[in-house]
């Protein structure tokens, strides 16, 4: 499991940094796990150079038995009886007149639980689009009502591969609503916006990265199987937000080092965190091409011969939509995501005031998988 989690985290950071280059100061929110799962399904059907590019970009080449590892990781994350709701759903929509290889369909069903739904792209592409959107809307509890905008599929579309992820979890320690107040959030050195700032004082896993002047806080969800980890720069240092320095050093090894439990102290922390909601939408073709996936999107070069006998199929678009809402109760996220305080005068305590931009991710603790990753820059 560890190999796959490491591969997925490396890709998560690669993609985050690619998106950050295009959008150095704005909000970002993705479910890298959802994108990796969807692309692993595509990987099943790729051959030759197309497969090699995917394998390298998604770091699948570092994982033995990548598909069976995904199968067990999905089962572990989606397990019944968990104290959170997390739904990861995959589906293939294929042109009904097109012949997909039976072994490809058997593999995607067995490994990723993805059935092939036959639709009529050729004569009724708009109806097909609505059908796909309706399914995603249902899987994400209505949070992603329109994954595919008008015109995204047409009569030449052969295959749409959909992955949706939905998460809702309550904090292990909820923020009291009555403690929430209006407070300024500093976007940069000059501009501010008012946010609803939540507050609580409890024992949390907290750390400080000296050379980056950055605080780390782990907020567990009920059941402690998932946590939100926040990286907050001390202050707005650089022209943007103090995050630049952190982002420049973001690697799998560093992230692991900064956030692993043995490097954090379990102490009293005064936590101020804004209530926030992000909805983002990405067409990932150019970002993935920059990271090395090129042939897949090229009709004359794509080799998807593991999906169909004919060499006439390629992936025209990879669309990713995501949603997250963080409030006093906990977090609701989708993408298409007991310390008893005793009173003691000498107890050290720390302040964690997220009143300026920060990075955050939602992690499945036992596997170390990053399910969602984002930057909150502006309400």
UniProtKB/Swiss-Prot annotation:
Keywords: Acetylation, Cytoplasm, Endosome, Lysosome, Phosphoprotein, Protease inhibitor, Secreted, Serine protease inhibitor
Residues bearing PTM Phosphoserine: 300
Positions of region (CARD-binding motif (CBM)): 351-379
Tissue expression remark: In human bone marrow, present in all CD45+ populations. Expression levels are highest in the neutrophil lineage, intermediate in monocytic, and lowest in lymphocytic lineage. Within the neutrophil lineage, expression is highest in promyelocytes.
Keyword Amino-acid biosynthesis assigned: no
Pfam families per the UniProt record, alphabetical: Serpin (PF00079)
GO BP: negative regulation of cell migration; negative regulation of endopeptidase activity; negative regulation of interleukin-1 beta production; type B pancreatic cell proliferation
Subcellular location: Secreted; Cytoplasm; Cytolytic granule; Early endosome
GO cellular component, one term: cytolytic granule
Record site: Reactive bond 2: 344-345
SMART domains hit by this protein: SERPIN (SM00093)
Top-rank taxon, per record: Eukaryota
Regions crossing the membrane: none
Modified residues (N-acetylmethionine): 1
Entry's Gene Ontology molecular function annotations: peptidase inhibitor activity; serine-type endopeptidase inhibitor activity
Site feature Reactive bond 1, where: 343-344
Keyword Phosphoprotein set for record: yes
PROSITE patterns: SERPIN (PS00284)
Function: Neutrophil serine protease inhibitor that plays an essential role in the regulation of the innate immune response, inflammation and cellular homeostasis. Acts primarily to protect the cell from proteases released in the cytoplasm during stress or infection. These proteases are important in killing microbes but when released from granules, these potent enzymes also destroy host proteins and contribute to mortality. Regulates the activity of the neutrophil proteases elastase, cathepsin G, proteinase-3, chymase, chymotrypsin, and kallikrein-3.
Subunit structure: Monomer. Interacts (via C-terminus) with CASP1; CASP4 (via CARD domain) and CASP5; these interactions regulate the activity of inflammatory caspases. Interacts with PRTN3. Interacts with GZMH.
Free-text note on domains in this protein's UniProt record: Reactive bond 1 is specific for reaction with chymotrypsin-like protease such as cathepsin G, chymotrypsin, chymase or granzyme H, while reactive bond 2 is specific for reaction with elastase-like protease such as neutrophil elastase, proteinase-3, pancreatic elastase or PSA.
Stated family: Belongs to the serpin family. Ov-serpin subfamily.
Protein's name in the database: Leukocyte elastase inhibitor
Source organism of this protein record: Homo sapiens
């Amino acid at each position: 499991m560890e190999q796959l989690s490491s591969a997925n985290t490396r890709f998560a950071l690669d993609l985050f940094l690619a998106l950050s280059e295009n959008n150095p100061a704005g909000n970002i929110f993705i479910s890298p796990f959802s994108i990796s799962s969807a692309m692993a399904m595509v990987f099943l059907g790729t051959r030759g150079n197309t497969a090699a590019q995917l394998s390298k970009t998604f770091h699948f080449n570092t994982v033995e038995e990548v598909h069976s590892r995904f199968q067990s990781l999905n089962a572990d994350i989606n397990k019944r009886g968990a104290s959170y709701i997390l739904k990861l759903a995959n589906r293939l929509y294929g042109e009904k007149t097109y012949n997909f290889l039976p072994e490809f369909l058997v593999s995607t069903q067995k490994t990723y639980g993805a059935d092939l739904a036959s639709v009529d792209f050729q004569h009724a592409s708009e109806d097909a689009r609505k059908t796909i959107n309706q399914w995603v809307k249902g899987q994400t509890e209505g949070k992603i009502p329109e994954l595919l905008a008008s015109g995204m599929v047409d009569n030449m579309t052969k295959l749409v591969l959909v992955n949706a992820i939905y998460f809702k979890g309550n904090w292990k320690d909820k923020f009291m609503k009555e403690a929430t107040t209006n407070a300024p959030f500093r976007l940069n050195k000059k501009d501010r916006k008012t946010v609803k700032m939540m507050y609580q004082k409890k024992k949390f896993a907290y750390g400080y990265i000296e050379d980056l002047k950055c605080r780390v806080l782990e907020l567990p969800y009920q059941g402690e199987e998932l946590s939100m980890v926040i990286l907050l720069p001390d202050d707005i240092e650089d022209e943007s937000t103090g995050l630049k320095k952190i982002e420049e050093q973001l690697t799998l090894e560093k992230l692991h080092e900064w956030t692993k439990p043995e490097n954090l102290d379990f102490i009293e922390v005064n936590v101020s965190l804004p209530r926030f909601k992000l909805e983002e939408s990405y067409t990932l073709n150019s970002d993935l091409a920059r990271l090395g996936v090129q042939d897949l999107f090229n009709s004359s070069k794509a080799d998807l011969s593991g999906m169909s006998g004919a060499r006439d199929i390629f992936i025209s678009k990879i669309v990713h939509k995501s949603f997250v809402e963080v409030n006093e109760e906990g977090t609701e996220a989708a993408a298409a995501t007991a310390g008893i305080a005793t009173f003691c005068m000498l107890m050290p305590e720390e302040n964690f005031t997220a009143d300026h931009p920060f990075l955050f991710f939602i992690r499945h603790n036992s596997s170390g998988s990053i399910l969602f990753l984002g930057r909150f820059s502006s309400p």
